[in-house]
Amino acid sequence: MKKTILICGLIVLILTGCSNSTKEKTPDIHSFEGTIVECEQKSMIVCPNESEDEYNSSDKFKIDYVDGFDSCNVGDVVKITYEGEINEIYPAQISVTKIELKSEEKNNVLKKINSIVENGPIMSSNPFDYIKASQKIYDELLDKPEETFRYAFSDLIQSYENNKSDLINYIEALLCREINTNFKYDFESASDYVEKYKEFLSTDYKSFNKYDIYAKLILK
């Protein structure tokens, strides 16, 4: 009887040990979504969405490319999967295991802006006539302010740096102005909007909102 009890006890200990061993080996996996704000040769800087827990650790993460990732474009939204803890230096660093490009959000905004331009009155060059002709689509863009601002402002900056300023850029500037009411300015062109907004962001203004903070990250 004692021998049987001893054997049962050993079996329990072995099973418990195996269970603990299995638990210890379980990977500590996390993920978050954010926006690319800087592209480098072997890494990129990503700003987590404010709704993500990681944002409480840092507003910037240095993400090393993995699995041959080569689609870094400022303004794109990505999902980052990582293992272990956050190294809270600045920018924060993590052990990245996977990078996924969330292109649907960007494509939706791009398609709607292009639709406004393509369906506008042929005889008019007035941006407000184009918006009036596709008011429903324009309002849909305003209904998703964060997505729209991220794409529109990123594209504005890229166009500005390439000395480009067209009807699409003007509509993007209008969207940014309507979404971010923290900066109010009656601009004459998309380039004019970008230049004056950059001046505003360089001031010591104490009440920058989330759109201003995102814009400052893009401009760094």
Labelled PLM ranges:
Residues 45-46, 80, 150:
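Short hydrophobic/aromatic-rich beta-strand segments that constitute the beta-sheet cores
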Residues 1-4, 9:
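Positively charged n-region of N-terminal signal peptides that target proteins for export
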